[in-house]
């Protein structure tokens, strides 16, 4: 089964300092048909205005991944991490038994544009932890680079969930195929540009939901940046 969901069908919230598109039900946006996909619970595409951000707030029992597309995200948490997250970095925070953090855009003029992703963990109540890694554009060019996985396979950040997250950059004749094990779900989110996923034309912000498929084929990219999720059913 293939289901294409257009960018304009996502939830949207404009808080002035924050503009956010919600792929799944989140905060004031509720759609019972879009509560998540497999163990993928949240994809928020956020744009934070200069000099603003999320004040200190808490999370529990969630694998939280941030992927910055433009600008820099300043992160501070109760684990003692005070870091900047630039474009191309993948940040993973396992909330576990509880963690508090803030996220700000300290730039005087540039908007911070990033994706915040939540994946439900396999186990609850674990000790919270933090990890951040850089993935160069060359590693993602014309292929799917694994950036988050159980056990941190292939240099990815480690998540405590039965899920694998890939990022790829595609243009022209570049293409990639990802095999899916029987019974898996998958989710393709196009960050920018254009691409075809299993023959379906996609524009920036579109998503393709897969259930019962044996592979993902990515072709015909035009300045495309794409995230692919291999998920527990």
PLM features: residue spans?
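Jelly-roll (double-stranded beta-helix
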Residues: 1-233
């Amino acid at each position: 089964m293939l289901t294409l969901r257009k960018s304009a069908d996502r939830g949207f919230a404009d808080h002035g300092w924050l503009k956010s598109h919600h792929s799944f039900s989140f905060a004031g946006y509720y759609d019972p048909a879009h509560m998540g996909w497999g163990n993928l619970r949240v994809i928020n595409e956020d744009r934070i205005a200069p000099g603003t951000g999320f004040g200190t707030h808490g999370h529990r029992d969630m694998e939280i991944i941030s992927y910055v597309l433009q600008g820099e995200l300043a992160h501070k948490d109760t684990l003692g991490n005070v870091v900047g997250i630039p474009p191309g970095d993948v940040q993973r925070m396992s909330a576990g038994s509880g963690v508090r953090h803030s996220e700000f855009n300290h730039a005087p003029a540039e908007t911070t544009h990033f994706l915040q992703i939540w994946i439900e963990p396999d186990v609850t109540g674990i000790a919270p932890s933090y990890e951040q890694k850089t993935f160069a554009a060359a590693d993602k060019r014309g292929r799917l680079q694994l950036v988050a996985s159980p056990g941190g396979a292939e240099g990815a950040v480690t998540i405590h969930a039965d899920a694998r997250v890939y990022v790829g950059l595609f243009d022209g004749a570049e293409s990639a195929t990802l095999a899916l094990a029987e019974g898996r779900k998958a989710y393709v989110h196009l960050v920018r540009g254009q691409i075809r996923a299993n023959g379906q034309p996609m524009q920036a912000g579109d998503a393709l939901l897969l259930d019962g498929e044996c592979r993902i084929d990515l072709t015909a990219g035009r300045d495309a940046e794409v995230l692919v999720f291999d998920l527990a059913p």
